[in-house]
Design a protein with these regions (language model features):
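Gly/Ser-enriched beta-turn/beta-hairpin loop segments
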Residues: 151, 163-167, 178-181, 223-242, ...
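C-terminal cap/linker of serine protease catalytic domains
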Residues: 30, 65-86, 139, 208, ...
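Catalytic-histidine neighborhood of serine endopeptidases
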Residues: 32-34, 115, 119-167, 176-177
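C-terminal recognition in membrane/secretory proteostasis and scaffolding
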Residues: 2-58, 263, 291, 298-417
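Terminal peptide-recognition signature
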Residues: 95-97, 110, 122, 126, ...
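Active-site substrate-binding loop(s) of clan PA
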Residues: 86, 112-114, 134-135, 159-161, ...
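Active-site loop architecture of trypsin-fold serine endopeptidases
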Residues: 28-34, 102-107, 128-139, 179-187, ...
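A conserved glycine-rich beta-strand in the N-terminal activation segment of trypsin-fold
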Residues: 78-84, 96-125, 153-159, 187-189, ...
Length: 417
């Protein structure tokens, strides 16, 4: 009998070389290259760049059925999803991604950033390392599959819009898809990841091991930390992540980490699978993900550019004081910092306005603001600035609170690879 289960043969795991640099409170040793990033989820050409899972055994392959479907289940996509429970909605917002790199194939996951069912259009967020390889470059063909429609006949062609190795985020675009028109594809709802607390319950949903959509559950272990990793192009990157203990595997890359309401709190990106470590997965926080997706679509869609554009104030900041606060609503504790300016770059837009020693209390860009209690509140927020944007900082200087305003110029914009 013909095996109707696989579109591609099992392929071995292409592993992106990744090293985590521990904080000074730990041993400070690097980890083997299999330990952290899901190197394109699954694999390419059986290349194995280090110790770890057997590339021909448990490494994730693409388990897309090869059924020759040419129609849709009666009424598919026509019912209201209002009655769908929060957990099940995550299956409608998460997708399987299969990439072809020449004669090689690899798989991962993604989430719907936006969906236009009438026209069959959508934007999808995934990890940059899902669609890019140091050896092969950008995937020459990207296919997307929906939950319950993971067969070759339902493949949806997707286009790379833009992305960033540094942030490990990419945006894909789908246009005029009959599958989307006849599906329950649903755009994700973003939670405020700045309000995520340790012990919060989470669900990881994605294409684990390339075997199709699945879900696991766990809790948040660390709400925000920074990993030093070797990215998709071989360069060293610093990636801000949250840590969680839900089981994730090769193929989960780019998939969603959700809260109990089915809202996105992060994009699953990495894990630690060393022999003496259990249940340490990492996701890029949803607040950062949304800012990156907006930036990429604004600067890259239907343009020659495919890189993130980031405005730089030209100031160096540090956490001069750190501590804890108690959330009055939940009773949870969370970390806070005093964010202090320690250096100002010559010729920057902040020169002559911001001073060394200023404590940044809040930042506003074009009238949209936020309180600053962590350093990343400033650095991440700058992704929303455009040429001509007005930035207002409220700072404490000499015991007084003052507002400082300046405008983003073209010279302040840098391309982030």
């Amino acid at each position: 009998m013909k095996d109707n289960k696989t579109l591609f043969n099992r392929v071995a795991a292409l592993i992106i070389v990744v090293v985590m640099l521990f904080s000074l409170t730990s041993c400070g040793l690097g980890l083997p290259i299999y330990n952290n990033m899901f190197g394109n989820g699954d694999g390419q050409n059986g290349n194995n760049n280090g110790d770890g899972d057997s590339p021909d055994g448990d490494g994730a392959g693409s388990n897309i059925g090869d059924g020759d479907f040419n129609g849709f289940y009666p009424g598919s996509g026509q019912e209201s999803i209002e009655g769908v429970n929060d957990a099940s909605k995550t299956l409608l917002t998460t997708v399987t991604i299969v990439c072809e790199f020449g004669t090689a194939a690899a798989a991962g996951s993604g989430v719907f950033y936006s969906v236009d069912k009438v026209n069959g259009d959508a934007y999808i967020i995934t990890n940059h390392h899902v669609v890019y390889s140091e050896d092969y470059g950008l995937a020459n063909e990207i296919s997307v599959y929906l939950y319950g429609m993971e067969f070759a006949g339902y493949a949806i062609s997707a286009e790379f819009v833009g992305g960033s190795v540094t942030y490990d985020i990419a945006v894909l675009k789908i246009e005029n898809s009959e599958v989307i028109k006849n599906s329950y594809a649903t755009q994700v709802t973003f939670a405020d990841s700045d309000k995520v607390r340790v012990f919060d319950k989470v669900y990881a949903v994605g294409n684990a091991e390339g075997d199709g959509m699945s879900a696991t559950e766990g809790i948040v272990s660390v709400e925000s930390e920074t990993l030093q990793l070797t990215g998709a192009d071989g360069s060293l990157i610093s990636l801000r992540v949250m840590r969680f203990d839900a089981a994730v595997n090769h193929g989960n890359s780019g998939g969603g980490l959700y809260n109990e309401k089915g809202q996105l709190i992060g994009i699953v990106s990495a894990k630690d699978v060393s022999a003496d470590v259990d249940n340490m997965g990492y996701a890029i926080p949803s607040d950062l993900v949304k800012k990156l997706a907006d930036n990429i679509i604004y600067h890259c869609d239907n343009k020659d550019n495919t890189q993130v554009n980031k405005a730089l104030m030209g100031v160096t900041i540090t956490a001069s004081v750190s501590g804890l606060k108690i959330d009055d609503e939940t009773g949870s504790v969370y970390q806070v910092e005093l964010v202090e300016v320690i250096e100002i770059s010559e010729g920057s837009i902040a020169q002559g306005k911001v001073q060394v020693g200023d404590i940044i209390n809040s930042i506003s860009i074009d009238g949209v603001g936020r309180t600053v209690t962590r350093m990343h509140h400033v650095t991440d927020f700058m992704l929303t600035a455009r040429v001509g944007s007005t930035i207002t900082l409220n700072v404490t200087r000499g015991g007084e609170n003052i507002n400082i305003t300046f405008v983003v110029t073209q010279d302040a914009i840098t391309l982030v690879k």
